[in-house]
Curated annotation (Swiss-Prot):
Disulfide bonds: none annotated. GO terms for cellular component: cytosol. Gene3D superfamilies: Phosphoenolpyruvate/pyruvate domain. It comes from Paraburkholderia xenovorans (strain LB400). This is Phosphoenolpyruvate carboxylase. Its EC number is 4.1.1.31.
Amino acid sequence: MKAVRSDKTTQAATTAQAQKPAKAGSSKIKIVTAAPQAANASARQPASAQAPAPKANGRTREDKDHPLFQDIRYLGRLLGDVLREQEGDAVFDVVETIRQTAVRFRREDDSAAAQTLDKKLRSLSPEQTVSVVRAFSYFSHLANIAEDRHRNRRHRIHELAGSTSQPGTIAHSLERLVEAGAAATPVLQEFFNNALIVPVLTAHPTEVQRKSILDAQHDVARLLAERDQQLTDRERAHNEAMLRARVTSLWQTRMLRDSRLSVADEIENALSYYRATFLEEIPALYADIEEALAEHGLEARLPPFFQMGSWIGGDRDGNPNVTAETLENAITRQAAVIFEHYMEQVHKLGAELSVSNLLAGASDALKELAAVSPDQSPHRTDEPYRRALIGMYTRLAASARVRLGEGSVPVRSAGRGAAPVRAKPYADSAEFVRDLHVLIDSLAEHHGAPLAAPRLSPLARAAEVFGFHLASIDLRQSSDVHEAVITELLRRAGVEENYAELPEADKLNVLLSELAQPRPLRLPFAEYSDLVKSELGVLEEARVTREKFGARAVRNYIISHTETVSDLVEVMLLQKETGLLRGCLGNANDPAQAGLMVIPLFETIPDLRNAPHIMRDLIALPGVDALIEHQGNEQEVMLGYSDSNKDGGFLTSNWELYRAELALVSLFNERGVTLRLFHGRGGTVGRGGGPTYQAILSQPPGTVDGQIRLTEQGEVIASKFGNPEIGRRNLETVVAATLEASLLPHGIAPAQLPAFEETMQQLSDAAMASYRALVYETPGFKEYFFESTPISEIAELNIGSRPASRKLQDPKQRKIEDLRAIPWGFSWGQCRLLLTGWYGFGSAVAAHLDSAPSDAERTRRLALLKKMHKTWPFFANLLSNMDMVLAKTDLAVASRYAALVSDKKLRKHVFERIVAEWERTSKVLSEITGKSERLAENPLLARSIKNRFPYLDPLNHLQVELLKRHRAGDTNARVRRGIHLSINGIAAGLRNTG
């Protein structure tokens, strides 16, 4: 089927290309945009015949990027060689033909190219199709690796040159603080004492990378980095052989999972990032901060203010596969990983700290540690550090054994080759930290301080940060589930027959009455439903987990769909029933103390607007102020970016989040309570994604204040933390931005804000009306969405453990409202419209400007928008993110997905509305920013899109062809497999998709 081409659509698609970064015609650019398997004589040579020349070190942008071009070309040739070896020249030639035709279609909006492409794709056998999809998918993955390598390369060159510090680094943040007079030691010490910064890893239905693929890609990245070094001919040949082997391994490795990912798989996937990045890089980050402070003559003791969190194993919202057993497995596996790390590091320290007390002294505390060690070797009687470390090792082994069971972690012999002794376990991780500091202090007192720096100090820091639990696991469940559990408990206890039907005030009366009672609700011998047993079982497991691994192991309970105060109080009562809440609410003699902080999640537009009222009413309840006091006088509130976007569109979601944050800060300041905001950000801009540094700095004044948690999801986890160097910088960026957002004075004069906010409110109202008119009020839009995107196929893909829809429905009962926000956004990315990151903005701004009663007033309104862009971080960040999304949008490719809609009239009507809005949005964005080209302010990303997207487009064209076959009833397993492979490849090419 040909793509839909009304005049307007064709014009818009052409405009879309014009708005993108211009295609350069230089030979260097052609190197990159040549096929990974270019069908010419030179490309037919083996990759080894064209090893890259030494990396250029020129000053022009093109020279700086030359090594990147070489790497992409080199990896592409390697892939081409492997493709020929594995599949033959015929498939290789098909890949090249499709690539060239797709490039023509992209650059020229060539209708003849579209017809040629259609014909070629229809002629492919299912086997050929799968091979072609895999080729382009792997090229996307390899191009990502090359880009990451180049980022590391440029960062290193920058540091070696001694250039000025870059935004997003601790050094840059401290320089800004010093300039602003906000960097005195007492100020910074207070900041670190009160700060809590926590990235939280979550598993989601759109996380599509298999661990086997990630592992192979890590190897490719490492080998590619080696090529920047001066290698001998033999070393280079060996490097190339290893690279060829890994690319061959990738080609022969299944890209997709055979079965749906289990929660246990998701846990292991997350743990791989700890081994690859977090265990080493987080302690290194602390050391970097200390070093940067010292360079400015500042001294501040760093408590463990930066920690890691996780939802994996504790997030039950919409996922029936998460149970008490899952939570137990999650914390057990996390603990096993951290115990293995500690024991490995202590073992290595035993080899390194060979200090003899015949040559250097030791503190009395260190001698005591050595004296109680089980080590009896006559060869180490004068080596107190080694003996102390052997004792610490056996205590760690015992600590793991009592918490995890026999044989849970590998244990080495404890001195003289003897079997591990039954040592006394550490009571908690703090005791282990104290022992490590005994070693550090003793070395410092006896001229051995340099010996602590390489391993001992980082280990002590790791133990402070990770404890015996590695990461705090949040519990999350939907408010309606809690209500059902409470209803059953109250009914069985004879307290209230139908709690769920009560008005809100009556619900609160019942809940508060029960929380004031010392007795439990549960009857000891009564039978309860599976739901009640499962929910209470999770909370009981959380109590046991806290007892075993410390209070930090599980400390938060998030209630999704929080709409009322009772939604929060219900969880307090459930904690009481499971021993997590002690005392009685409102009783001054025995005040309630909750083990888990009850955290509301406000997601929809109405809920965000209601958030301050709910929190005000909660704090006003008798005894809640004492409960919050017990929590350190802190209260966390989570804000959801996904559902608010799906509910009201990009602009309104951002604005309502901004308003809710300001209102919450005002309320909490008034009550003298510290507010910590938890940002439920995703990978896509429509779900709060975008550069973290700018996102944090654009938060409303006073809303960060050293306290922030934020989710890391989907593909973002792999792209941010798969590479240790990039992972370290991403972690540093979060700290740097939090420092600046908390301590720097905000630049906008209060007099400007009212005008800005009034304009934003007008734009938001208009944008939401435009968005909802399309998504929720257009007859047939539901059918358009389900037919023009691979949403149904995404639901089938074995990506995550959670279903893609909140309900399982047959096609006749599908509703946009029931669809999870994450696959909703993911689907718009797949068809290259990325509608969730821009739709409605153009109409809103155009109406705002065009409704001006005079040209002078229009000019004034536009000038105000320009001022907002230049001086208001919130608005500037919003436009920057939208700019990125518009650059990634491709109307020409999207038109081919529109052609999948069976109702031609519906197809034309909806797609032309989307195209018209894209044109309006691009036009007004250019008017406000003064930049006619997309990503004019972000040339790095502009080049990335230009270099990679010609290889992404064929995947879209192939996906459309496969969707046609699948929906026409083709039952060939390779067709379904090809669709799923294309979903994977497009996600990799877009990068921020989760």
